[in-house]
Curated annotation (Swiss-Prot):
Topological region Cytoplasmic: 1-25, 109-112, 155-177, 228-266, 326-331, 377-388, 442-459
Membrane topology: Multi-pass membrane protein
Residues with the N-acetylmethionine modification: 1
Organism: Rattus norvegicus (Rat)
Phosphoserine found at: 6
The name this protein goes by in its record: Proton-coupled folate transporter
Glycan-carrying positions: 58, 68
GO terms of molecular function: folic acid binding; folic acid transmembrane transporter activity; folic acid:proton symporter activity; heme transmembrane transporter activity; methotrexate transmembrane transporter activity; proton transmembrane transporter activity; symporter activity; transmembrane transporter activity
Amino acid sequence: MEGRVSPVGSSHRLLTAAVLFRGPVEPLVFLANFALVLQGPLTTQYIWHRISTELGYNGTRHRENCGNQSADPVLKEVETLTSHWTLYMNVGGFLVGLFWSTLLGAWSDRVGRRPLLVLASLGLLLQAVVSIFVVQLQLHIGFFVLGRALCALLGDFNGLLAASFASVADVSSNHSRTFRMALLEACIGVAGTLASLLGGHWLRAQGYANPFWLALAVLIVMTLYAAFCFGETVKEPKSTRLFTLRHHRSIVQLYVVPAPEKSRMHLALYSLAIFVVVTVHFGAQDILTLYELSTPLCWDSKLIGYGSAAQHLPYLTSLLGLRLLQFCLADTWVAEIGLAFNILGMVVFAFATITPLMFTGYGLLFLSLVTTPVIRAKLSKLVSESEQGALFSAVACVNSLAMLMASGIFNSLYPATLNFMKGFPFLLGAGLLFIPAILIGVLEKVNPHPEFQQFPQNS
């Protein structure tokens, strides 16, 4: 049964034959995140303005009289409904993606990384098309949820990241893997910074539609690159059925089947650590735009663009910081330093009532993203070379669950705490980050130099 060729497997053989050159995976991640970040804040602002119009709120947020709007009940209802629709989008994506991203990730261990990259690219492309229809035709904002679910059905950005990180693990040595993981995350940051700066200015100049069209064009290029230019990193791809429980079993076996070369405790606890880090990261990201739109900050689209750019700069600064700190510190200590700066940034956000203080919080996050590549690299070294896709699909599942928890906690907590402390969700995030800090330290103490699985030393 496992040897039967699926239609997707046939497509995989055609793609293999049509590859133009063996390109790296980093451009895919760059283009995907550029398109996503270009759409993300714009989608939040579009939902805000649509709800404002429906409720009769004029939607203006003049910064000189911003403080006088704090008691406006209509404004609070706009904030609450916008937060809830953001939650619905994330829940829709999670419920569909929980099954598909794990299935496709483990499947890529056998058929190669390219088929998953192509499917995930098509999903992101489809989501952009739905968003354009909503904006151009003034469709109900509930269609954003449909677009998110359709994207998750084909793997979503989490599936693309799973294949990308697995691809890096396929070709990197144990020594270089942490930096290669950070380099991939830096592509996310550079793309996010550029998209944020462009999106804010473009919205002010020409409205919502054109940025979504640019995102669509970028995603078309990305899909073509994945199909015809990406260099396959799995050494011997095999045609394998997609719809089989074997792929999900391979993920479960990572955590429950004993093996002399790996520690199930380290796998589970490092997964918990990255779960908490991602929960706080995406939870804060979910409410930051809403936090900045509302009183007392009342940012316009230009400032929101600058803020979103500053939010993505740590991907690049963390890469540089990681490279420098690795010369004098072990990876574990680098991760702990990153968590410390992340906690400081969250605390500043919680009490930020003026624009300079918000940007101070963004500045303190300059090393906040060194933690995740360290954890990913440690996880990758705990499993065999043939289990990288299963591992990173499991991590993608953890990411999806973390994003759902983030949306559920932060988007529900934010409107509930508007009356006594708007910044309370950021304080909660700062407190949660002590959990991975403790876990990483304890795991290093239990086994200071875990090298459970040695890969061939590829360049």
